[in-house]
A protein has these predicted regions:
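N-terminal Rossmann/SDR dinucleotide-binding element
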Residues: 1-68
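NAD(P)H-binding glycine-rich loop region in Rossmannoid oxidoreductase-like domains
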Residues: 55-91
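Short alpha-helix in the Rossmann-fold core of NAD(P)-dependent oxidoreductases
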Residues: 74, 84, 89-96, 112-115, ...
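Short-chain dehydrogenase/reductase
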Residues: 89, 126, 132, 137-145, ...
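Conserved Rossmann-fold NAD(P)-dependent oxidoreductase catalytic core, especially the SDR/UDP-sugar
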Residues: 97-139
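Conserved beta-loop-beta element that borders a ligand/cofactor-binding pocket
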Residues: 115-116, 148-173, 183
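Active-site Tyr-X1-5-Lys
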Residues: 122, 135-162, 190-191
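C-terminal substrate-binding subdomain of Rossmann-fold SDR/epimerase-dehydratase oxidoreductases
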Residues: 193, 198-342
Length: 342
């Protein structure tokens, strides 16, 4: 079985590609490679077929001999999505619909879409399930809602989309990100001795280890198609819902000699949501998470220490997606629409 993984050289994609190849799948990766040279751990998969192309330039020929699609490629978080709202719409929504249409035309039935729990937006204190009202507050979250709606309308006996609404990922992957909350808190603790919280610490977020997230994609790929056909699944565990300040407390227990510091820079951030994961636990039997946040914080701390992560590296372009893209724009390596310049 040959799987097309878009965004395979990103944080989640680099982990998912490894997991798929380790299980014996054929994998074709498609990535525009904005983050080339930003590796945390060197990796090379000789059995991987790589297409170096912008998702917006995809053609039907790129889908030849593909049996299923896992679509990760996107401007990949809320701050990045606000860089250019129109561009976020073009890459995250329009390119997604185009890819799904080409996949359907090519007879590819399984289409697994990387959605996000961020679409719940401001959800209060009650746990939200897949059928709860959506309240996206950022361009990124809106693009996920619109993409789900469009792909759902395309579903029929020949095309079976499924929507994996991911919790906030954490943990070590070959293409590390330090702009995700747990990875970021550990980075501040390790490089400065201060666990820097930019809000008042009260917002809720669900968290999931990047490996567990990859395993969820594989469980979805391997289960009976009738179980996941045109379904949305929140991806995570009930016990992994945390307030930001509770995440910081875990980091404080693990990283020696650090203390919590509140900066209130993002005090206006209204996003908060507790998520129910009953559906994935009961219906996607192949999904069995291996991690929890404390285990993940230990992994991050040990990896940062072994790597010798410096403050400049941690806060620079390499592991912060928005910084890297701004750097490419400033150097005129990419144009204003994020296409590579010739």
């Amino acid at each position: 079985m040959n799987i097309l993984v878009t965004g395979n050289n990103g944080y989640i994609g680099s982990m998912l590609t490894k997991l798929l190849l380790d299980k014996g799948y054929g994998v074709t990766g498609l990535d525009t490679n904005y983050y080339r040279g930003c590796e945390f751990n060197s990796f090379h998969y000789p059995q991987l077929k790589q297409i170096n192309k912008d998702i917006r330039a995809l053609t039907k020929k790129d889908l030849e001999n593909i049996d299923a699609v896992i679509h990760l490629a996107a401007l990949s978080n809320d701050p990045l999505g606000e860089l250019d709202v129109k561009l976020t719409y073009e890459i995250n929504y329009e390119a997604t619909v185009k890819l799904a249409s080409l996949a359907k035309e090519s007879g590819i039935r399984r289409f697994i879409y990387a959605s996000s729990c961020s679409m719940y937006g401001i959800a209060g204190k009650e746990a939200v399930a897949e059928d709860s009202p959506l309240a996206p507050v950022t361009a990124y979250a809106i693009s996920k809602v619109k993409s789900e709606e469009a792909l759902s309308k395309m579903a029929d006996e020949n095309f079976s989309p499924v929507f994996l609404r991911a919790s906030v990922a954490y943990g070590i992957a070959p293409m590390l990100r330090c702009d995700l909350v747990v990875n970021n808190l550990v980075g501040w603790a390790y490089t400065t001795g201060k666990i820097r919280i930019m809000s008042d610490g009260t917002p809720w977020r669900p968290a999931i280890h990047v490996e567990d997230l990859g395993l969820a994609y594989i469980a979805c790929l391997e289960c009976q198609i009738e179980i996941v056909h045109n379904q949305a699944f929140n991806v995570g565990q009930d016990k992994e819902n945390y307030q930001i300040r509770d995440m910081a407390s875990v980091v404080k227990r693990v990283v020696p000699g650090c203390e919590v510091e509140y900066t209130y820079e993002h005090d206006s951030d209204s996003r908060t949501y507790i998520v129910s994961f009953d559906k994935i636990a009961t219906e996607l039997k192949g999904f069995s998470p291996r991690w929890d946040i404390e285990k993940g914080v230990w992994q991050l701390y040990k990896a940062y220490k072994a790597h010798g992560l410096t403050f400049d590296e941690f806060t620079g372009n390499k592991y912060i997606r928005l910084n890297q893209l701004k750097g490419l724009i400033q150097k005129k390596t990419v144009d204003e629409k994020l296409f590579w310049r010739a």
